[in-house]
Regions:
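Cell-envelope/extracellular polymer assembly enzymes that use nucleotide-activated donors
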Residues: 1-2, 29, 182
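Conserved short acidic donor-positioning loop in nucleotide-sugar-dependent glycosyltransferases
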Residues: 9, 35-37, 62, 71
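Short, well-formed alpha-helical segments that are part of the catalytic scaffolds
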Residues: 9-23, 40
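Hydrophobic helical membrane-anchoring modules
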Residues: 11, 172-248, 265, 269-296, ...
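A conserved acidic beta->alpha catalytic loop
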Residues: 34-44, 60, 96
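Acidic donor-binding/catalytic loop of UDP-sugar-dependent glycosyltransferases
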Residues: 39-40, 85-86, 92-109
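Conserved donor nucleotide-binding strand/loop of the catalytic core
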Residues: 45-88
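Acceptor/aglycone-binding surface of glycosyltransferases and processive sugar-polymer synthases
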Residues: 54, 60, 66-74, 100-177, ...
């Protein structure tokens, strides 16, 4: 079994974590990644190396996602060179918030289901920092909207996976905290089932040791959704501009509306393919799926809007409800089908 501990500017708790794992899981191979902490923290890393951990070092801070990728790449080289069979990997935070018994539970879950991505899920009861509780609710809700799958703890750092998943893990986007969320988003699309095992919720000193930056890292985590929203707004601007220009040139409203929609839809398709989703299938195939989706959404828009107005909802409110629902549906379908 491999245990990965990414660390940035740690304290003495890192040493305690490594000591506890070494004592209670003596066969585990511990990999600590120094993510550019600086010379002032070398004593902590030297001590973990003395205890028996392998320490990998980034010259500068690259982010948690990059630290995990560095560890995955190291493990892959070791597995290949030593001709090792599939092994469970468990990622653990450096601040002591993950208990040994929970690390063992996650590892056992991977041994039983090696194709799964296993999450150590906290219950979020008791004294949980407000930002942690709120952040997890937002990301869990967004994840469920996008994938249709319920995950109770999207931000857990205690995760398990098999070494067989390393090639997939190394190809995921993101180098900071968004990497872990991207891992969840891409798991279902790639055919890797997500499962959870309950773990004890532990927060030390109100989670002050966390290097999560609420604004900057939240933007990174939600960037796929924000990019999708941005392309939708830009497409609307293109649609309106094209409509006015075409109508001024042709004086034909129907032709102008149709051509403007074709131009804006084509623009959004290209933007979503190259900026938001990065599909594995060909652009032609994705484009065909996209325009089929556009036609379906257009029909749904009409029927849903007319139905809401028919039951007495005002046109403005009905339009708002319709566009919001179809926006979420569109994102989910494009993520899971159109640009898969």
């Amino acid at each position: 079994m491999y245990i990965i501990i990414p660390a940035y500017e740690p304290d003495k708790r890192l040493i305690q974590v490594v000591q506890d794992i070494t004592i209670k899981l003596p066969k585990a191979r511990i990999i600590v990644v120094n993510d550019g902490s600086g010379p002032g923290y070398n004593d902590y890393y030297d001590e973990t190396a003395f205890i028996g951990a392998t320490v990998l070092t980034h010259p500068i801070n690259k982010g948690k996602g990059a630290a995990l990728k560095t560890a995955f790449a190291h493990i892959q080289e070791e597995v290949v060179s030593q001709h090792l069979s599939a092994q469970p990997i468990v990622t653990v935070d450096s601040d002591g918030q993950h208990l040994i018994k929970d690390i063992v539970r996650v590892a056992k879950a991977i041994e039983e289901n090696p194709s799964h991505l296993v999450l150590g899920a906290r219950a979020f009861v008791g004294k949980v920092p407000a930002r942690s509780r709120f952040g997890n609710k937002v990301t869990a809700g967004l994840f469920r909207l996008v994938t249709g799958q319920k995950v109770t703890d999207t931000q857990t750092g205690l995760r398990g996976m098999s070494t067989d998943l390393i090639p997939w893990l190394l190809n995921l986007d993101g180098n900071r905290f968004e990497y872990e969320f991207n891992m969840l988003l891409e798991a279902k699309k790639s055919g890797h089932q997500i499962s959870e095992v309950p773990i004890e919720t532990v927060y030390l000193e109100e989670n002050k040791s966390s290097h999560f930056r609420p604004i900057r890292d939240s933007i990174r985590i939600y960037s796929p959704f924000l990019k999708f929203s941005g392309t939708a707004v830009l497409a609307s601007v293109i649609d309106a501009t094209a409509l006015f220009v075409l109508f001024a040139l042709t004086k034909n409203l129907l032709l102008s509306v149709v051509l403007a929609r074709v131009i804006s839809a084509s623009s959004q398709c290209l933007l979503n393919a190259n900026v938001v989703f990065n599909p594995t299938s060909s652009l032609f195939r994705s484009s065909v799926r996209y325009f089929m989706l556009v036609l379906v959404l257009l029909a749904c828009n009409y029927f849903l809007l007319s139905s809401l107005v028919a039951i007495g909802l005002g046109l403005v409110l009905a339009k708002l409800v319709t566009e919001t629902l179809l926006f979420l549906v569109s994102y989910k379908v494009q993520h899971n089908v159109v640009f898969a």
